[in-house]
Amino acid sequence: TSFFGMKTTTERITKERVFGILSFIIDNQPFELNVYQGESAGEEDVDTNYLFLPFLDESNGLTTYGGGRYIDLYVPVGDTLIIDFNQAYNPFCAYNDKYSCPIVPRENYIPLNVTAGVKSFKNY
């Protein structure tokens, strides 16, 4: 699969490719999300097996960061990969807009409220 330019919250563009399509079921509803691998995978200090799963859901902007959340995954040995939404985290730009964060592709939208993982925070 060829690499494409994924937009970020700044002018920077990351080079990603769709590594695979993750198919799963939540509450008897089937869903699919693209999982990505960066062009830098395998370079110095970058794990060759690292995969990037950005997603949007109904909680964004309400109880979670409006721009979506990410889950870090790794290339599986077989053809099964476990998605643990408890591992969902906010991108760095949720905390400081000076960071450059990949914008979650619209096709990675889940039309339900994912209550697991990191939530929004309040400034104190």
Regions found by a protein language model. Give the residues of each.
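A short pocket-lining beta-strand/turn micro-motif at the edge of beta-sheets
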Residues: 49-51, 79-81, 97, 108
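Short beta-strand segments
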Residues: 29-33, 69, 81, 110-112
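Short, surface-exposed linear segments at secondary-structure transitions and domain or protein termini
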Residues: 40-48, 73-81, 122
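Residues that cap or initiate secondary-structure elements
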Residues: 30, 39, 59-61, 77, ...
